[in-house]
């Protein structure tokens, strides 16, 4: 069942003061103004200047005007969001944003002790994320889509609008005569997410009017299953050791080996192996029956190799 913006904010219970990630677009404008109405004097706006568009300075000026009118302190961080070779532009921008949020929280911590940050992704964004994951053949982590709450670098992140349709946010703003800016990149059909939004979501709306709620329910089921797999991986790691030791690892079934290795790589190194890389690694582990068997396989941005009785991951670019 979809939720209205007022109801979503009523149920939202963060620690105060609260920072809202504010781009100037409709979604973050609605979240910022609704939170500022509920907690006057307790809300701050974090704006990240990516420098990727000529209009970035205009975005910042717009945010300054809105925050001044709403009496919300605005904190701006300029970042270099250009992507490195082999890195997607979206991933580079995302990483830069989170680093900026962490820096802004540190900059303001002496004054306001901000520990909670709210992001404005809504129900349509959640559907788009799930469809993108399906198109890539993602496993449970991808099918879980976006979490409503998580902790990163000591900060509590929240997505209180995941049950609210995007159209509801714009209608709420129009009722108040509140303005926002349109990011030109949102209309760029070169991006798959934009094509999903413009072409696929209207078809889903016509065929399955409740698709936002049902897709969200599927993502929640996937998130629960993912949590169980993480618990199993932790139990197996406690027996196999960190870094993983080959002999006890080989005693596990192939699916449990894969689950353990995915969790170890992601939790320890933020490395995500491809399906092909993981399959090759599992084949090598199965074939490793002698002390002299050598393993060295490209995995994510680094390599896994056998050292003695265990497996080790390293990134040559980061090694001294």
Report residues per predicted region.
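Core alpha/beta nucleotide-donor-binding catalytic domains of modification enzymes
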Residues: 1-198
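Mid-to-C-terminal catalytic subdomains of enzymes
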Residues: 170-220, 224-227, 306-309, 315
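Electropositive, surface-exposed helix/loop patches at the edges of structured domains
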Residues: 108-124, 214-233
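AMP-forming adenylation/ATP pyrophosphatase catalytic core
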Residues: 2-26, 39-44, 48-50, 79-83, ...
């Amino acid at each position: 069942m979809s939720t209205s913006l007022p109801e979503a904010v009523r149920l939202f219970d963060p620690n105060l003061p609260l920072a809202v990630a504010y781009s100037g677009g409709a979604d973050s404008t609605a979240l910022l103004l609704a939170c500022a109405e509920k907690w006057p004097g307790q809300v701050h706006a974090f704006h990240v200047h990516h420098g990727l568009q000529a209009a970035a300075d205009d975005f910042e000026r717009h945010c300054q005007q809105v925050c001044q009118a709403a009496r919300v302190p605005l904190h701006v961080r300029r970042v270099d969001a250009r992507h490195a070779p082999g890195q997607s532009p979206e991933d580079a921008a995302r990483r830069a944003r989170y680093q900026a949020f962490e820096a802004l929280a540190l900059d303001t911590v002496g004054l306001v002790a901000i520990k909670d940050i709210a992001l404005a992704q809504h129900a349509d964004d959640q559907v788009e994320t799930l469809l993108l994951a399906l198109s890539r053949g993602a496993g449970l982590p991808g099918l879980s889509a976006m979490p409503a709450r998580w902790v990163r670098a000591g900060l509590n992140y929240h997505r209180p609008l995941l049950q609210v349709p995007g159209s509801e946010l714009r209608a709420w703003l129009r009722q108040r005569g509140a303005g926002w800016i349109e990011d030109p990149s949102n209309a760029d059909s070169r991006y798959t997410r934009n094509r999903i939004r413009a072409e696929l979501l209207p078809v889903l709306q016509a065929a399955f009017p409740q698709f936002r709620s049902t897709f969200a329910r599927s993502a929640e089921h996937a998130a629960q299953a993912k949590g169980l797999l993480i618990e199993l991986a932790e139990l197996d790691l406690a027996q196999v050791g960190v870094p993983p030791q080959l002999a006890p690892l080989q005693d596990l079934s192939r699916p449990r080996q894969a689950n353990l290795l995915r969790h170890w790589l992601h939790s320890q190194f933020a490395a995500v192996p491809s399906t092909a890389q993981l399959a090759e690694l599992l084949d090598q582990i199965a074939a490793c029956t002698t002390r002299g068997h050598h393993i060295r396989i490209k995995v994510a941005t680094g390599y896994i190799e056998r050292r003695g009785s265990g497996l080790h991951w390293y990134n040559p670019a980061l090694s001294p």
